[in-house]
Amino acid sequence: MTLEFSQLGLAPDFVDYMQGWDLQRDIHNKVVAGEKNSTVLILEHAAVYTAGKLTEDHERPFDGTPVVPVDRGGKLTWHGPGQLIAYPILKLKNRAGIRDYVERLEAIMIAVMQDYGIKAVTVKGRAGVWILADDKGPDRKIAAIGIRVLDGVTMHGVAINCSNDLAPYAQIIACGITDASVTTMSLETGRTINPADIVDRFVEEFSKHDEALVSTPEGALQ
């Protein structure tokens, strides 16, 4: 395997968003240059709002809370304690296979949730992973995806709602979606599931896609 996993910090050692972004860019440059293997960063962020390239002004926090503009796709979202973040920085085997990459990210998260009895699905026309409307409520998003591919190497990634407070979402139009809500693995199961609880399973599931996704650079560490 040439894919590396690096756990930067989980509760209580939250990672500042800008610190994590700087590290992403540094690793991205090295992967592009063939100086480092493809790497997946795993962490929990300190609380922050981030705005993708498609964010509109009316979707920003209603109380004027600062927002970090980022170069990923998608719109406005929140990251913070209780949410597992994974930033795959991968040299894609198929540069044109971005849709396949996104679908694999969704499949990885769905497989992890199945272990906890959560019936998560994808919804046509909407990125991320969802719980369909049931007696608990309307359609609700349980995991988000926002990526960028530059020089054939991915950045940004996924956010899985494990045990995070949903109050910050009340201040924004999350991901530009007005007709659905958000949820967490803990809410769906009725028991506390923290990011640290699912890391090993996430890594295991992600590793199954290594050969299909990742191009092995010449001289990569084996």
UniProtKB/Swiss-Prot annotation:
Protein origin, superkingdom: Bacteria
Record's GO cellular component terms: cytoplasm
Catalytic residues in the record: C175
InterPro entries reported for this sequence: aa-tRNA-synth_II/BPL/LPL, BPL_LPL_catalytic, Octanoyltransferase, Octanoyltransferase_CS
Pathway: Protein modification; protein lipoylation via endogenous pathway; protein N(6)-(lipoyl)lysine from octanoyl-[acyl-carrier-protein]: step 1/2
GO biological process: protein modification process
Reactions that this protein is recorded to catalyse: octanoyl-[ACP] + L-lysyl-[protein] = N(6)-octanoyl-L-lysyl-[protein] + holo-[ACP] + H(+)
Keywords, comma-separated and alphabetical: Acyltransferase, Cytoplasm, Transferase
Pfam families named among the record's database cross-references: LplA-B_cat
Primary localization: cytoplasm
Enzyme class: transferase
Enzyme Commission number(s): 2.3.1.181
Cited NCBIfam families: lipB, PRK14345.1
Function: Catalyzes the transfer of endogenously produced octanoic acid from octanoyl-acyl-carrier-protein onto the lipoyl domains of lipoate-dependent enzymes. Lipoyl-ACP can also act as a substrate although octanoyl-ACP is likely to be the physiological substrate.
Annotated family: Belongs to the LipB family.
Protein name as catalogued: Octanoyltransferase
Organism encoding this protein: Paenarthrobacter aurescens (strain TC1)
Originating gene: lipB
